[in-house]
Amino acid sequence: MATNPKREVLNRKRALFYFLPAAGYAALIFALSSMALDMEELGPVLAFDKLLHLAEYCILGYLLMRAFATSGVPALAASPMAATILAGSVYGLSDEIHQAFVPGRVASLTDLLFDAAGVSLAALTYPYVRYRLGPVRALENRIEAEVSRR
């Protein structure tokens, strides 16, 4: 079966447009969790630690859901919610394991649960958020159309 080269280029550009923000944000999470911490200096921040995990992974979940829902990959597009929750939770697990090897950091099951909750919250609310943010969706469509023309 012959494939259309223009369509392949378009699919690659589309994949970059949607997956690059998710990959970049995952790299940011990794970089932040690589920083050694002094627990005494972070006393006040630790009170909000779980909310920070929830928010951090909610953003990742939204970016993953956006990428999977528009990927054009049948397995991902068929169930982007499940793919988002699975991928985000596995990434959270890998991040917690990574933190076990960083001075001043510890791996925490509670943190992992808040990571998974954040990703799940994003996946479950994504359709509503996309509906409510119609102007954002319209802007994304214009940008994607411009990228496709190049």
How would you describe each model-predicted region?
Residues 22-33, 81-100:
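Small-polar-interrupted transmembrane alpha-helices in polytopic inner-membrane proteins
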Residues 2-67:
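"…centered on the first transmembrane helix and the immediately adjacent amphipathic helix/loop
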Residues 55-71, 119-131:
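Membrane-interfacial alpha-helical segments at the cytosolic side of multi-pass membrane proteins
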Residues 13, 17-21, 52, 79-83, ...:
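Alpha-helical transmembrane segments of integral membrane proteins
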Residues 68-76, 98-102, 106, 129, ...:
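Membrane-interfacial segments
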Residues 1-12, 134-150:
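Membrane-interfacial, low-structure loops and terminal tails that flank and connect transmembrane helices
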